């Protein structure tokens, strides 16, 4: 059984390192569609919205209301591949969707990422060595577990959607292990 995680100090805790017999488990490291390359900072914060409705829209509204007041450049990706929306409000750029290549570049060009705590996203962030605030989708127990586990490991900041404070999380994330 191939497992996309590190053999030691895994990214998914008990989800990828079960207590039962692991003789047939082969840890292949994180998998990602993205590639790390040289980049220059363009955004202070990149917020990636995803998840099932209505949580996707709730998350977007919370992020937009806070990012619109942010002093530095921010990008919010709405997670709507069917739309072609673009807007610029103060220092906040809003785009409905980015291709994989564009998203790879946007992540690399951002100081801090705010996103859901899905396992594929976590592997992408680790591959690109990017710091992030993880906000699990409410009711998604795997995401809640991963965000809590990785926060305890001091890899990422974890905040719940209802009480999300970007300014507090930004300050707290300065104390976490720098991945880049």
Question: What do these predicted regions represent?
Answer:
Residues 5, 50, 118:
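Short glycine-/small-residue-rich Rossmann-like dinucleotide-binding loops
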Residues 6, 80-82, 138:
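Residues in the short beta-alpha loop(s) of Rossmann-like NAD(P)-binding domains
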Residues 22-23, 71-72, 130:
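A short helix->loop->beta-strand "cap" motif at the edges of active sites that frequently abuts
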Residues 26-29, 94-97, 155-164:
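Short acidic-hydrophobic, aromatic-tinged amphipathic segments that line or gate anion-handling sites
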Residues 103-145:
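A donor-sugar binding/catalytic signature common to diverse glycosyltransferases
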Residues 127-175:
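Nucleotide-sugar donor-binding patch of glycosyltransferase catalytic domains
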């Amino acid at each position: 059984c191939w497992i996309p995680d590190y053999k030691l100090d895994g990214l998914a805790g008990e989800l990828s390192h079960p207590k039962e017999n692991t003789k047939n488990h082969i840890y292949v490291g994180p998998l990602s569609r993205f590639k790390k390359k040289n980049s220059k900072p363009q955004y202070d914060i990149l917020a990636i919205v995803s998840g099932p409705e209505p949580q996707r829209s709730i998350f977007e509204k919370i992020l937009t209301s806070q990012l619109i007041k942010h002093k530095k450049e921010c990008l919010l990706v709405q997670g709507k591949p069917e739309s072609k929306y673009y807007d610029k409000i103060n220092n906040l750029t809003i785009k409905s969707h980015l291709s994989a290549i564009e998203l790879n570049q946007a992540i690399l060009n951002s100081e801090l990422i705010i996103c859901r705590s899905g396992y594929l996203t976590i592997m992408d962030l680790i591959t690109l060595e990017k710091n992030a605030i993880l906000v699990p989708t409410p009711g998604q127990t795997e995401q809640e577990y991963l965000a809590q586990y990785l926060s305890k490991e001091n890899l990422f900041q974890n905040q719940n959607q209802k009480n999300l404070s970007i300014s507090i999380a930004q300050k707290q994330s300065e104390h976490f292990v720098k991945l880049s």
